């Protein structure tokens, strides 16, 4: 016979009646001394934390990453040195713009983030399924997100807002080519690719630095939905991607992704007609070949979504020895913003939560704050100090010195913007079916968008490829010729 398990308060005292509040007699008022009631209501009032300002809707899973090819020639990162090295990971997939309980069928980039619990500390891969972003400079990040979020007056997402922003931000054109393809509505999280979007630096034992981008390729293949297919699913199910991921893992059908690295020698940085460190530019595989790094397998669902999937925090600046951020202007802003939002959302000690806490030992002088439940206990909480048993800095882990490019400090316009060349590359690489889907999806999304905004976007599209602009214009009933004469 199973031993009875008592219901208790958070203080551990058994609860005798969880159905009726304590009152002053049968018809009297409820008593303030009812500790069970007050504790229960007070905790309920505080169950939620602010949702993420982006990537609020997400699903996650635990798993492992196995290094399949040594990366010694590129980096001294410990977990990438030897073939066969296994590293515990937690992955989180998400939509970007919409709220925590929004449909997973909406057109949106998909977040693709992985926390590696390495022997030398945590490493966060923070990416998307799409290989580029809307903007190249972090100073515009709040603006692009505001344009895509609901109107603050109506609380309704409005195409006039984001297409207005896009039309005046021509660097967004390549992202538009991806987002409004069917890849903007993926079939499931198991069938999306992942990209670091940004370039990073890897440094090897000799101190040689290379720029890299990282790519995840799903072993299940990339599968997308048409707008009509997405609408059919949404009519029946808001949670199709989360459900699919959860059920696949529960059934032992563990999703897998191969990780690849693309490498650029710094001496070749100026060899292109674009800036390879610009987040609005893709590194196409035939120009920057893929090298296989390893394989990630997700094999365990979270035990508690709030404590794990909701509370996990990522930052592209969380890197291990042998890795550094690049000079990418968007990345540089994200290095601050991501941990800052976790401190606001979860608390200053969010790294002490089990899902965020490294497996590597933590030894420093950062103490106290709200909820310090993994408090360090030494009486010496300063450094330098003369106590041999206390943690000391280790010069072996000093970051490799990096060359600074440029000699002027100021708000300088990015060099080689090439806002339309990469979008043209994407168009040229699309099949006829992919081009047709892109045009249709844009035309459908322009329902209700003002003509002046459409025309500004069409002028951008014309500079990508006249055929593309003409097909979108035909779909919207706009006479393109009178609006692009000066571009010919």
Curated annotation (Swiss-Prot):
The UniProt record lists the keyword Zinc-finger: no
CC cofactor: heme
Pfam families: Catalase, Catalase-rel
InterPro entries per record: Catalase, Catalase_AS, Catalase_clade1/3, Catalase_core, Catalase_haem_BS, Catalase_immune_responsive, Catalase_sf
Keyword Transport assigned: no
UniProt subcellular location: Cytoplasm
Family listed: Belongs to the catalase family.
Protein name according to UniProt: Catalase
């Amino acid at each position: 016979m199973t031993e009875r398990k008592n219901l208790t308060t958070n203080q551990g005292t058994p609860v005798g009646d969880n159905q009726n509040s304590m009152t002053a007699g049968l018809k009297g008022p409820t008593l303030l001394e009812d500790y069970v009631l007050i504790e229960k209501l007070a905790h309920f009032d505080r169950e939620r934390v602010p949702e993420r300002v982006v990537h609020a809707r997400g699903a996650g899973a635990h798993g492992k990453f196995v290094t399949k090819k040594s990366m010694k020639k590129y980096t001294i990162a410990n977990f990438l040195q030897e073939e066969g090295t296994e590293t515990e990971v937690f992955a989180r997939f998400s939509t970007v713009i919409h709220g925590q309980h929004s449909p997973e069928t909406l057109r949106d980039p998909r977040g693709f983030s992985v926390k590696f619990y390495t022997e030398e500390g945590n490493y966060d891969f923070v990416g998307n399924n799409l290989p580029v972003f809307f903007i190249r400079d972090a100073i515009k990040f709040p603006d692009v997100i505001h344009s895509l979020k609901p109107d603050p007056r109506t609380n309704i997402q409005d195409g006039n807002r984001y297409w207005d922003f896009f039309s005046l931000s021509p660097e967004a054109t390549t992202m538009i080519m991806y987002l409004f393809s069917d890849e903007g509505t993926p079939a499931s999280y198991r069938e999306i690719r992942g990209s670091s979007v940004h370039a990073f630096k890897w440094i090897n034992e000799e101190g040689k630095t290379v720029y890299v981008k990282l790519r995840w390729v799903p072993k299940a293949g990339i599968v997308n939905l048409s707008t009509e297919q997405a609408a059919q699913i949404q009519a029946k199910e808001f949670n199709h991607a989360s459900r699919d991921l959860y059920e696949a893992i529960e059934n032992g059908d563990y999703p897998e992704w191969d990780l690849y690295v693309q490498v650029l020698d710094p001496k070749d940085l100026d060899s292109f007609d674009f800036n390879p460190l610009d987040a609005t530019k893709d590194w196409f595989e035939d120009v920057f070949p893929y090298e296989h790094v390893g394989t990630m397998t997700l094999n365990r669902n979270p035990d508690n979504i709030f404590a794990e999937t909701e509370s996990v925090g990522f930052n592209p600046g969380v890197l291990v020895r042998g890795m550094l951020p690049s000079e990418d202007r968007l990345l540089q802003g994200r290095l601050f913003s991501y941990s800052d939002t976790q401190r606001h959302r979860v608390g200053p000690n969010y790294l002490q939560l089990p899902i965020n806490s490294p497996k590597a030992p933590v030894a420093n002088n950062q103490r106290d704050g709200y909820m310090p439940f993994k408090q360090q206990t030494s009486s010496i909480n300063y450094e330098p100090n003369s106590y041999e048993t206390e943690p000391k800095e280790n010069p072996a882990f000093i970051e490799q010195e990096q060359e600074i490019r440029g000699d002027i400090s100021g708000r300088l316009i990015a060099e080689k913007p090439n806002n339309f060349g990469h979008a043209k590359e994407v168009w040229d690489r699309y099949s006829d079916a992919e081009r047709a889907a892109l045009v249709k999806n844009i035309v459908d999304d322009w329902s209700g968008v003002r003509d002046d905004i459409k025309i500004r976007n069409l002028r951008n599209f014309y500079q990508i490829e006249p055929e593309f602009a003409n097909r979108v214009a035909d779909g919207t009933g706009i006479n393109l010729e009178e609006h692009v004469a000066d571009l010919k």
